């Protein structure tokens, strides 16, 4: 757990134009709108156009966040892109984003902590801000529609594409929400619960792998749900205890938008009596690392956060991993 202490001075988001209904995504998987809604709470999602890549989504969200922050790309010190669906295995997607934004001279790197990635990226830029100053652009962006098996009802109904972004600056930059504390956790013994089996150095993707569908995202949904419902509430309670914050002090809860039904279960176990849980899963689905910053940006634009309120971000996903951030608005 780390005290980080910098401000969020702007947020932004981007989702593709194409709306994909439950009936459209469910038909090849043999399920209908009613089944998907009951199991996930998701009613629709957005999928990228054929000519869009993850960096395109990330760039659009980054531009929106920079505009909200009132700074130019040239003022950035570092860009961190959290993604598990990069444009290519190499180079980093963040390099494309840097170029598209015109952020010449800015350091740029990727973070792959799957759906926990944005808070991991947020923590990763803290050192750069301390030692070099300036501003950081943190983006969560994923394009899962390209790695889904259309016949796998356990996964294809869950995911949408999108990107969300935050501009961070030192606490000396006037007023605005302060990131007070972050915590990162990884449970490497559970790596097989969420995976894309082939395409890396352990198992290069060949014709046999393609025939077997090993290029697709795969998940042990039952065990993932067990991990989340059993571990996440306790990890969050420990995080708040170490931060010296009572559960009743939390005004807003912004979790990773994995599955609407599962979010209700987790929120019920947390016992945050005054907190509002913010959601976008019904309209955007699970957007991977993008889900927290997309949901946070929606709340910012709705005027949901008030000065002095505490906001809790909670990421969880492949690794297995979990990540938390405490923000004082």
UniProtKB/Swiss-Prot annotation:
Q: In which pathway does it act?
A: Metabolic intermediate biosynthesis; (R)-mevalonate biosynthesis
GO biological process, alphabetically ordered: fatty acid biosynthetic process; isopentenyl diphosphate biosynthetic process, mevalonate pathway; secondary metabolite biosynthetic process
InterPro entries, A to Z: ACP_syn_III_C (IPR013747), ACP_syn_III_N (IPR013751), Thiolase-like (IPR016039)
Catalytic activity annotation: malonyl-CoA + acetyl-CoA + H(+) = acetoacetyl-CoA + CO2 + CoA
GO MF annotations, alphabetized: 3-oxoacyl-[acyl-carrier-protein] synthase activity; acyltransferase activity, transferring groups other than amino-acyl groups
Q: Which SUPFAM superfamilies match?
A: Thiolase-like
Membership in a protein family:
Belongs to the thiolase-like superfamily. FabH family.
Quaternary arrangement and interactors, per the entry? Answer: Homodimer.
Task performed by this protein:
Catalyzes the condensation of acetyl-CoA and malonyl-CoA to form acetoacetyl-CoA and CoA. Does not accept malonyl-[acyl-carrier-protein] as a substrate. Can also convert malonyl-CoA into acetyl-CoA via decarboxylation of malonyl-CoA.
PANTHER family according to UniProt: 3-OXOACYL-[ACYL-CARRIER-PROTEIN] SYNTHASE 3, BETA-KETOACYL-[ACYL-CARRIER-PROTEIN] SYNTHASE III
> Would you tell me the protein name for this molecule?
Acetoacetyl CoA synthase NphT7
């Amino acid at each position: 757990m780390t005290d980080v202490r910098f401000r969020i001075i702007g947020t932004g988001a981007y989702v593709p134009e194409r709306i994909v209904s439950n009936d459209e995504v469910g038909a090849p998987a043999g399920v209908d709108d009613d089944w998907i809604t009951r199991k996930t709470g998701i009613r629709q999602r957005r999928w990228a156009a054929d000519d869009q890549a993850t960096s395109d989504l990330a760039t659009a969200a980054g531009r929106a966040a920079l505009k909200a922050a009132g700074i130019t790309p040239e003022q950035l010190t570092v860009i961190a892109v959290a993604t598990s669906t990069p444009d290519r295995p190499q180079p980093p997607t963040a390099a494309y984003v840097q170029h598209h934004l015109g952020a010449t001279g800015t350091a740029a790197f990727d973070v792959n902590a799957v759906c926990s990635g944005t808070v991991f990226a947020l923590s990763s830029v803290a050192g750069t801000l301390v030692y070099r100053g300036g501003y950081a652009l943190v983006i969560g962006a994923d394009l899962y529609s390209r790695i889904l098996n259309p016949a796998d009802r356990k996964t294809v109904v869950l995911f949408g594409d999108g990107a969300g972004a935050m501009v961070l600056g030192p606490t000396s930059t006037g007023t605005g929400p302060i990131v007070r504390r972050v915590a990162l956790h990884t449970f490497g013994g559970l790596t097989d619960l969420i995976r894309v089996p082939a395409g890396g150095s352990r198992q290069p993707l060949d014709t046999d792998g393609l025939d077997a569908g090993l290029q697709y995202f795969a998940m042990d949904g039952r065990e993932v749900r067990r991990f989340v419902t059993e571990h996440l509430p306790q990890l969050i309670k420990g995080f708040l205890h170490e931060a010296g914050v009572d559960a009743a002090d939390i005004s807003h809860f912004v979790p990773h938008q994995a599955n609407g039904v599962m979010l209700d279960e987790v929120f019920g176990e947390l016992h945050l009596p005054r907190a509002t849980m913010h959601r976008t899963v019904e309209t955007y689905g699970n957007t991977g690392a993008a889900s927290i910053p997309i949901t946070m940006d929606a709340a910012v634009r709705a005027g949901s956060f008030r000065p002095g309120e505490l906001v809790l971000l909670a990421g969880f996903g492949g690794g297995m991993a979990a990540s938390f951030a405490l923000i004082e608005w």
